[in-house]
Amino acid sequence: MEIKRDAYLQQLIERKDNGMIKVITGIRRCGKSFLLFTIFKRYLLENGIGSDHIIEIALDGIENEELRDPKMCFKYIKDAVKDDGKYYLLLDEVQFMPRFEEVLNSLLRMSNIDVYVTGSNSRFLSSDIVTEFRGRGDEIRIYPLSFAEFYSVYDGDYDDAWDDYMIYGGSVSYTH
């Protein structure tokens, strides 16, 4: 069963195509990657965006290690854009790339790319993250699961769910 994070999806939808970098922040394991790569991607596909116009990069995976290089990543993204249609860049764990701010600001100069990034280190959790993009960033802060969200996918009774929630908190990883 999938946890619904409709409020966060709605925030992404409201900011779609606004010309700013959507910066999704939150502590580790709170569901940022799932929100971006599963829930938001599904929304894009269901609303007519072709999979060939969605560019997904997870920088924490070894398979994308070479894309941690700023110039390689920028070239990869630029080469993935094949026409004048709108493209959606979903870039996970951007803090793995040195000088990521330069890459993101360069991408903003390409009018047909809508940029979404996640990050979870202390730099991304600070209130200064949006200012790093010189007024071109839009932060969406993700929180751990509420008890209602946790219980909606919990396999057990209410009291056991409450006990586990009090022990483990709202970590998305516990519910899987």
Where are these regions (language model features)?
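Phosphate-binding site recognition
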Residues: M1-Y174
